[in-house]
């Protein structure tokens, strides 16, 4: 013999599930006429690409961006009123940036490493030496930097200047 309470519970559960599914598929309705709210633009996913001396690598790891008040006594000194610090890395590359909120953004400092095959390009974190050494642009949460930096290359003595480019989109 079937327990009638068990049958009622199944029927109520199935009805609730059906109402939930129907509610999720129906568009919202309103008694007010007029256009609905415009669809929001999808935000770009966090990403970073680094280029050193013609070699390009897309970083597959996490991109972290943190904005805080600029610290004039930091080394290197931070310009603007806010500083965005960007860190992105994976097994083959890493990027560390300090960018001001100026328009266009000032680059307070940068560090880049990129391993391509047996060559390991290392630009230790360094301040920008001149206004034309590194140029940056910002569009929304995306930054593009191009310039030259002092790099150490294993197997070579001393540091040398290398061209680089970075494109990063913050989350």
Curated annotation (Swiss-Prot):
Lipid-carrying residues in chain (S-diacylglycerol cysteine): 29
Keyword Kinase listed: no
Topology in membrane: Lipid-anchor
Keywords annotated in UniProt: Cell membrane, Lipoprotein, Membrane, Palmitate, Signal
Chief place where the protein resides: membrane
InterPro entries assigned to the protein according to its UniProt record, in alphabetical order: LpqH
Protein name according to UniProt: Putative lipoprotein LppO
């Amino acid at each position: 013999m079937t327990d009638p309470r068990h049958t009622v519970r199944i029927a109520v559960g199935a009805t609730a599930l059906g109402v939930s599914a129907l509610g999720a598929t129906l568009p919202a309705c309103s008694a007010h006429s007029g256009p609905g709210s415009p669809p929001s633009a999808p935000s770009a996913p966090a990403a970073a690409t680094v280029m050193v001396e013609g070699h390009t690598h897309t970083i597959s790891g996490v991109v972290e961006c943190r904005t805080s008040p600029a610290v004039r006594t930091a080394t290197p000194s931070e310009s603007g009123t806010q500083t965005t610090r960007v860190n992105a890395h994976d097994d083959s590359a890493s990027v560390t940036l300090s960018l001001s909120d100026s328009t266009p953004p000032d680059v307070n400092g940068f560090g880049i490493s990129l391993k391509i095959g047996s060559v390991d390009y290392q630009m230790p974190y360094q301040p920008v030496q001149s206004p034309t050494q590194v140029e940056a642009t910002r569009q929304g949460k995306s930054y593009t930097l191009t310039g030259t930096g002092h790099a150490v290359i294993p197997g070579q003595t001393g540091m040398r200047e290398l061209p680089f480019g970075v494109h990063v989109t913050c989350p």
